[in-house]
Protein backbone atom coordinates (compact mmCIF):
# COMPACT_ATOMS: atom_id res chain seq x y z
CA UNK A 1 0.00 0.00 0.00
CA UNK A 2 1.39 3.39 -0.90
CA UNK A 3 0.86 5.97 1.80
CA UNK A 4 0.34 9.59 0.99
CA UNK A 5 1.84 11.82 3.70
CA UNK A 6 -0.88 13.25 5.87
CA UNK A 7 -1.26 15.17 9.07
CA UNK A 8 -4.22 14.63 11.35
CA UNK A 9 -6.38 17.73 11.41
CA UNK A 10 -8.21 16.57 14.52
CA UNK A 11 -6.98 15.75 18.04
CA UNK A 12 -6.53 12.20 19.30
CA UNK A 13 -4.68 10.99 22.38
CA UNK A 14 -2.30 8.67 20.49
CA UNK A 15 -1.68 6.60 17.39
CA UNK A 16 0.83 3.74 17.46
CA UNK A 17 1.90 2.10 14.21
CA UNK A 18 1.94 -1.67 14.66
CA UNK A 19 3.02 -2.41 11.09
CA UNK A 20 3.02 -0.83 7.67
CA UNK A 21 3.66 -2.70 4.47
CA UNK A 22 3.14 -2.31 0.77
CA UNK A 23 -0.55 -3.22 0.97
CA UNK A 24 -1.60 -2.97 4.64
CA UNK A 25 -1.32 -0.58 7.58
CA UNK A 26 -2.19 -1.42 11.20
CA UNK A 27 -2.45 1.19 13.98
CA UNK A 28 -3.67 1.32 17.55
CA UNK A 29 -5.64 4.53 18.02
CA UNK A 30 -6.58 5.98 21.41
CA UNK A 31 -9.12 8.78 21.80
CA UNK A 32 -9.82 10.66 25.01
CA UNK A 33 -13.19 11.80 26.36
CA UNK A 34 -15.02 13.79 23.67
CA UNK A 35 -12.51 13.04 20.88
CA UNK A 36 -13.56 11.42 17.62
CA UNK A 37 -12.46 10.49 14.13
CA UNK A 38 -14.46 12.90 11.92
CA UNK A 39 -16.53 11.90 8.88
CA UNK A 40 -14.33 10.76 6.00
CA UNK A 41 -13.94 7.99 3.43
CA UNK A 42 -11.17 6.14 1.59
CA UNK A 43 -11.09 5.63 -2.19
CA UNK A 44 -9.55 2.14 -2.23
CA UNK A 45 -8.98 0.73 1.25
CA UNK A 46 -11.20 -1.07 3.73
CA UNK A 47 -11.04 -0.01 7.39
CA UNK A 48 -11.28 -2.93 9.83
CA UNK A 49 -11.93 -1.88 13.45
CA UNK A 50 -11.40 -4.01 16.58
CA UNK A 51 -12.47 -2.40 19.86
CA UNK A 52 -9.77 -2.58 22.57
CA UNK A 53 -11.42 -0.20 25.06
CA UNK A 54 -14.95 1.02 24.80
CA UNK A 55 -17.68 0.89 24.01
CA UNK A 56 -17.11 2.75 20.76
CA UNK A 57 -19.35 3.64 17.83
CA UNK A 58 -18.66 3.41 14.08
CA UNK A 59 -21.31 5.20 12.02
CA UNK A 60 -21.60 4.97 8.23
CA UNK A 61 -23.57 6.78 5.52
CA UNK A 62 -24.93 5.16 2.37
CA UNK A 63 -25.71 2.72 3.79
CA UNK A 64 -26.62 4.48 7.05
CA UNK A 65 -25.60 2.12 9.83
CA UNK A 66 -24.46 2.34 13.45
CA UNK A 67 -22.12 -0.27 14.93
CA UNK A 68 -21.70 -0.24 18.71
CA UNK A 69 -18.52 -2.15 19.51
CA UNK A 70 -17.60 -3.53 22.90
CA UNK A 71 -14.15 -4.90 23.73
CA UNK A 72 -13.28 -7.61 21.18
CA UNK A 73 -16.05 -6.67 18.72
CA UNK A 74 -15.13 -5.76 15.17
CA UNK A 75 -16.60 -4.26 12.02
CA UNK A 76 -15.44 -3.33 8.52
CA UNK A 77 -16.12 -0.24 6.44
CA UNK A 78 -15.54 -0.79 2.70
CA UNK A 79 -14.00 1.75 0.32
CA UNK A 80 -16.05 4.82 -0.64
CA UNK A 81 -18.32 4.56 2.43
CA UNK A 82 -18.22 7.67 4.64
CA UNK A 83 -17.69 6.87 8.31
CA UNK A 84 -17.24 8.54 11.71
CA UNK A 85 -15.85 6.97 14.90
CA UNK A 86 -16.47 8.06 18.49
CA UNK A 87 -16.87 6.76 22.01
CA UNK A 88 -20.35 5.82 23.19
CA UNK A 89 -21.68 8.85 25.10
CA UNK A 90 -18.40 10.64 24.19
CA UNK A 91 -16.36 8.35 26.47
CA UNK A 92 -12.70 7.51 25.87
CA UNK A 93 -12.05 4.55 23.55
CA UNK A 94 -9.22 2.61 21.91
CA UNK A 95 -9.16 0.43 18.82
CA UNK A 96 -6.96 -1.52 16.47
CA UNK A 97 -7.35 -0.28 12.90
CA UNK A 98 -6.24 -2.47 9.98
CA UNK A 99 -6.33 -0.68 6.61
CA UNK A 100 -5.82 -2.15 3.16
CA UNK A 101 -5.51 -3.05 0.35
CA UNK A 102 -4.64 -0.14 -1.95
CA UNK A 103 -3.39 3.42 -1.91
CA UNK A 104 -4.17 5.18 1.38
CA UNK A 105 -6.11 8.43 1.34
CA UNK A 106 -8.42 10.19 3.79
CA UNK A 107 -11.11 12.33 2.20
CA UNK A 108 -13.06 14.51 4.67
CA UNK A 109 -16.85 14.60 4.40
CA UNK A 110 -18.98 17.40 5.85
Where are these regions (language model features)?
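Short, conserved beta-strand element in jelly-roll/cupin
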Residues: 31, 43-58, 98
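A short hydrophobic beta-strand segment most commonly corresponding to one strand
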Residues: 48, 91-106
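A short, N-terminal "cap"/entry segment at the start of jelly-roll beta-barrel domains
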Residues: 1-27, 38-39, 108-110
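Asparagine-centered strand-capping/turn motif at beta-strand->loop junctions
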Residues: 85-88
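Short acidic-glycine-tyrosine-enriched beta hairpin
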Residues: 63-79
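Structural motif
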Residues: 55-57, 82, 92
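Histidine-centered divalent metal-coordination motifs
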Residues: 40-42, 83
Amino acid sequence: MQSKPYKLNYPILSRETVMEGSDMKVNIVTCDIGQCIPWHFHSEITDSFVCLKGPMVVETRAPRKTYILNIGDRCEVPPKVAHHVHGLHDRAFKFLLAQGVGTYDNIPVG
